[in-house]
């Protein structure tokens, strides 16, 4: 029977084979016509790669079927070693949320009067509710970066 082999270049080769022929036998016939060694050939039929020891009838290849010839790729990339670090990773700073943190800015005395413990930023860009941080010799606004020296 006659089968067709389509190469990568689009060229179609006709081969005269029997259904009892092995895939090895077909590859050697392709080598005779094209000069490609059998170990570099991969034959594909109906989306499946054909194994060397099997016959054409195992894959239900009939007369005038078309096989696709693909060349085998060489090797693959080396597997990289995992990097071993000498120092441990730096632990990221975790933002701790304090419940009712606003209460640290005010003090309520026995008579119910509310006293502000921290100073509000006087800059017009900050607005109400922006408090200045107390340092040992100054007060600092974290929003507008205003610094006031303490006397």
From Swiss-Prot:
- UniProt GO BP: modification-dependent protein catabolic process; protein ubiquitination; ribosome biogenesis; translation
**Locations listed in the record:** Cytoplasm
Q: Know the name of this protein?
A: Ubiquitin-ribosomal protein eS31 fusion protein
Record's Gene Ontology CC terms? cytoplasm; extracellular region; nucleus; ribonucleoprotein complex; ribosome
What is any Pfam family matched here? Ribosomal_S27
Glycyl lysine isopeptide (Gly-Lys) (interchain with K-? in acceptor proteins) cross-link located where? Answer: 76
Per UniProt, which keywords does this protein have? Answer: Cytoplasm, Isopeptide bond, Ribonucleoprotein, Ribosomal protein, Zinc
User: Which PROSITE patterns does the record cross-reference, listed alphabetically?
Assistant: UBIQUITIN_1, UBIQUITIN_2
Miscellaneous remark of the record: Ubiquitin is encoded by several different genes. UBI3 is a polyprotein with one copy of ubiquitin fused to ribosomal protein eS31. UBI4 is a polyprotein containing 3 exact head to tail repeats of ubiquitin.
Cofactor(s) needed by this chain: Zn(2+)
Positions contributing to Zn(2+) binding: 121, 126, 141, 144
Keyword set includes Cell inner membrane? no
* Superkingdom of the organism of origin: Eukaryota
Instruction: Describe the location of the Ubiquitin-like domain by residue ranges.
Output: 1-76
Gene Ontology MF terms in the entry: protein tag activity; structural constituent of ribosome; ubiquitin protein ligase binding
Which family does the similarity line name?
In the C-terminal section; belongs to the eukaryotic ribosomal protein eS31 family.
């Amino acid at each position: 029977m006659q089968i067709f082999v389509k190469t990568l270049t689009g060229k179609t080769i006709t081969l005269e084979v029997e259904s009892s022929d092995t895939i090895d036998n077909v590859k050697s016939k392709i080598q005779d016509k094209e000069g490609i060694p059998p170990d570099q050939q991969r034959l594909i039929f109906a989306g499946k790669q054909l194994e060397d020891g099997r016959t054409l009838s195992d894959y239900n290849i009939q007369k005038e079927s078309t096989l696709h010839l693909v060349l085998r790729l060489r090797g693959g990339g080396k597997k990289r070693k995992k990097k071993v670090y000498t120092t441990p990773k730096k632990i990221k700073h975790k933002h701790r949320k304090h419940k009712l943190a606003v209460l640290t800015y005010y003090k309520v005395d026995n008579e119910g009067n509310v006293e502000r413990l921290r100073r509000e930023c006087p800059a017009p860009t900050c607005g109400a509710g922006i408090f200045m941080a107390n340092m040992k010799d100054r007060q600092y606004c974290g929003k507008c970066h205003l610094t006031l020296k303490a006397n």
